[in-house]
Amino acid sequence: MKRFAFKMKLKPGFEREYEKRHSELWPELRKQISDSGVKNYSIFWDKDTNILFGYQEVEGDANSQDVEAADEITRKWWDYMSDIMDVNPDNSPVTIPLMEVFHLD
């Protein structure tokens, strides 16, 4: 199982909307994430900086973000979220990978 961590940026004032949209995650997106090998996925919010910290555990060799980028459902989700996050020209969230420096099982 591979572990991935990354950070994203939430626009100020949208923390409740971000949480609401994720609490209503589309069933087809939930399935797509699971089918791409993600077995554990959490997102945390730093209220002082509006930085979102994502953590995933992924089975197999694929980086789940690469798999998701090719998926139409994911692209629709990106469009849906683009008004409340920093995004790239294709509306994917600006995602900065983080390097693991310690792990303890």
Where are these regions (language model features)?
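A general secondary-structure signal for short beta-strands and their flanking turns/coil
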Residues: M1-R3, T49
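Short, glycine- and small/hydrophobic-rich beta-strand elements in well-ordered beta-sheets
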Residues: R30-F53, E57-E59
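Short amphipathic alpha-helical segments
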Residues: F14-K39
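Active-site-flanking beta-strand signature of metal-NTP-handling nucleotidyl enzymes
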Residues: F4-K9
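Beta-strand elements of well-folded, non-transmembrane domains
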Residues: L10-P12, G60
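A hydrophobic membrane-anchoring alpha-helix module
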Residues: H103-D105
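An amphipathic, aromatic/His-enriched active-site/gating alpha helix that lines ligand/cofactor pockets
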Residues: S36, V58-I96
